[in-house]
Amino acid sequence: MEHEYPDDLRYLDSHEYVRLDGEIATIGISAFAIEQLGDIVFLELPEVGEAVEVGESFGHIESVKAVEDLYPPVSGTVIERNEAMIDSPELIGDDPYGEGWLLKLRVVNPDNELDDTLTADEYRSQVEGEA
């Protein structure tokens, strides 16, 4: 199945994405990851005010098939979490790049944060190899 990977996002090889708007980062998971997980039944995210660091899990997503840790593409402080997705995680797949976002962070260092992320084309090539 072919998925959309918006060009204005950056991706991790673990399937999280980030949209950076100045010092505010919106984080979610890709359509490919959602398809691989299947029906999502539970989502655990950090509280507003908590710090998240690149390379350290900030929560997890649970489906009928698996439980996966979530990793932030950027470091920062949580300024908002998508309570609608926590309450109804099965809706994440309806609009993963819009209403299905997970966290918003105030980024520590916006200029250097995207160094270890993939462009949409790089990510598309990677997931086509996994499918």
Curated annotation (Swiss-Prot):
Disulfide bonds: none annotated. InterPro entries: 2-oxoA_DH_lipoyl-BS, Biotin_lipoyl, GCV_H, GCV_H/Fam206, GCV_H_sub, Single_hybrid_motif. Residues 24-106 form the Lipoyl-binding domain. Coiled coil: none annotated. One of its GO terms (cellular component) is glycine cleavage complex. Pfam families: GCV_H. Its cofactor is (R)-lipoate. Belongs to the GcvH family. PANTHER family: GLYCINE CLEAVAGE SYSTEM H PROTEIN, GLYCINE CLEAVAGE SYSTEM H PROTEIN-RELATED. The glycine cleavage system is composed of four proteins: P, T, L and H. This is Glycine cleavage system H protein.
